[in-house]
């Protein structure tokens, strides 16, 4: 089967999973979330149940319910809903892939298993093929995030093998700082969508020819990142650098506080006004109410909101 249709491009928000105070999934919030992304952040693509969405901490049934609701609420408003279906269990991944196809998702993606890891690149591609064949009508993307999976195969070589073995393969979500490998993916496999996943280095990836970007900060800084992409595409490198440096300064402020994914969920709630709730254990947010003013002040100073 050939997939010669639409390409994934532009910004793709890696969505947080809304939860109640008891850390149960909170489906009614998703409509408000979709409207906020489209109307306030000008983001029309989402990546659901990935790292930002705490996908590995959710049950298969929860992930199915979330996929259905995101697809339902995005219909007619968004361009693409990509469902991450990666699990530690191959059968669960195949089940989620088939479900994503049945509920109307636009594409699927999987991350490399991170406990019992594939022993070789060939084994990983075989694993990918099994999942892709469970939803042969959907474009399939590999999600590369070696910092969490511990799997460091060269992705330009993975693209070659995937091209030979997986008819529905369409590209990679590349969440790593290795811009040489990323650049080779872009230059050697122009038929694939190469989506960059390190928000603070997006401008560098654009210089290498990134087709788009998937990230958590595009939930609440989507418009500003869109401005940076427009400046780059228009040849205004000075403005693009200015915006990227402001975004980096904000992220450095956050990282220096020792914060990560749990705190980014809190920041999204604060900036958007959407009640996303807490992360699910073992994640735990250390943001206190007295931090909110300093976060907003920093973002205002950097002209990010």
UniProtKB/Swiss-Prot annotation:
One GO molecular-function entry: N-acetylneuraminate lyase activity
Claim: Cytoplasm is one of the keywords in the record: yes
Main location: cytoplasm
Pathway membership, UniProt: Amino-sugar metabolism; N-acetylneuraminate degradation
Signal peptide residue numbers: none
Subcellular location: Cytoplasm
UniProt-recorded name of the protein: N-acetylneuraminate lyase
């Amino acid at each position: 089967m050939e997939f010669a249709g639409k390409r994934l491009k532009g910004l793709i928000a890696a969505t947080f999973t809304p939860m109640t105070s008891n850390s149960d999934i909170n489906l009614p919030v998703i409509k408000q979330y979709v409207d906020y992304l489209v109307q306030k952040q000008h983001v029309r693509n989402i990546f659901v149940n990935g790292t930002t969405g705490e996908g590995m901490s959710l049950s298969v049934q929860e992930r199915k319910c979330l996929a259905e609701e995101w697809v339902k609420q995005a219909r007619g408003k968004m361009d693409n809903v990509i469902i991450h279906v990666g699990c530690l269990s191959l059968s669960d991944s195949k089940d989620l892939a088939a479900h994503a196809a049945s509920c109307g998702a636009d594409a699927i993606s999987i991350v490399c298993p991170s406990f019992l890891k594939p022993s070789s690149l060939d084994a990983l591609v075989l694993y990918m093929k099994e999942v892709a064949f469970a939803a042969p009508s959907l474009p399939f993307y590999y999600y590369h995030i070696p910092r969490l999976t511990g799997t460091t195969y060269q992705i330009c070589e993975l693209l070659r093998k995937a091209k030979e073995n997986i008819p529905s393969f369409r590209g990679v979500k590349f969440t790593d700082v290795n811009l040489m490998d990323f650049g080779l993916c872009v230059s050697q496999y122009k038929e694939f969508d190469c989506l960059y996943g390190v928000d603070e280095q997006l401008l560098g990836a654009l210089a290498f020819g990134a087709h788009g970007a998937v990230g958590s900060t595009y939930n609440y800084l989507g418009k500003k990142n869109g401005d940076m992409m427009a400046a780059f595409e228009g040849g205004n490198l000075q403005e693009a650098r200015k915006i990227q440096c402001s975004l980096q300064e904000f992220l450095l402020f956050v990282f220096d506080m020792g914060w990560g994914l749990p705190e980014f969920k809190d920041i999204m709630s604060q900036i958007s006004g959407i009640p996303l709730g807490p992360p699910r254990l073992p994640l735990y947010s250390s943001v206190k109410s007295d931090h909110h003013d300093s976060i907003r002040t920093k973002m205002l100073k950097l002209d990010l909101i």
